[in-house]
Amino acid sequence: MVMMRIFFFLFLLAFPVFTANASVNDFCVANGPGARDTPSGFVCKNTAKVTAADFVYSGLAKPGNTTNIINAAVTPAFVGQFPGVIGLGVTLARLDLAPGGVIPMHTHPGASEILNVVEGTILAAFISSGNKVYEKALYPGDVMVFPQGLLDFQEITGKIAPGLCELRQRNPGLQILEFQHCFPTIFPPKTIAGTTCLDEATIKKLKSGLGGTN
């Protein structure tokens, strides 16, 4: 099976609260992978202990596991994985799509997004707060922007589709509606049916496939 890959490069918006440490100092390396964010921000690693390795991340070298219901995988390099990006207004992630892969309807609550197609064809769209759909087939060299917080999706329509994506935020967040709000949850099928216009049999099937309970 030919693997289709998209590489997402995510650049973060330099809000003052997020970049305070980097504004005062040359940089702020979070104190280790998985460092916890606090109301006052991340704790910076002692600069005397910072090395070049803190500004290098190799976690995107390996393709993500696309053996799942959406035939896709996202491998992030946000501050939780890449401590060196804190306060710099830049981060990245990798997206791998297998044949038939799709990134379902989702939103980045804290980030706008830019997608650049390198090869292949991608169908991309977002929905405005006025419920207007902006949809476009993207070809190599095309760039599409997705406003912050709006629902959007990407679907592979060609055989291969590497691309670049930028997200304007330090830790852009990702909420995939089907995964986080409906089907994997403990909400009973009847409740979800009343809010999605899907029949209960379909909902039970989706919940089962996404690890939810009926």
UniProtKB/Swiss-Prot annotation:
SMART domains: Cupin_1. Disulfide bonds join C28-C44. Keywords: Apoplast, Disulfide bond, Manganese, Metal-binding, Secreted, Signal. Mn(2+) binds at H106, H108, E113. PANTHER family: GERMIN-LIKE PROTEIN SUBFAMILY 3 MEMBER 3. Oligomer (believed to be a pentamer but probably hexamer). GO terms for molecular function: manganese ion binding. Residues 58-204 form the Cupin type-1 domain. This is Germin-like protein. Belongs to the germin family. Residues 1-22 form the signal peptide. It comes from the Eukaryota. Induction: Expressed with a circadian rhythm, with peak expression 10 hours from the beginning of the night. It comes from Ipomoea nil (Japanese morning glory). It is found in: Secreted, Extracellular space, Apoplast.
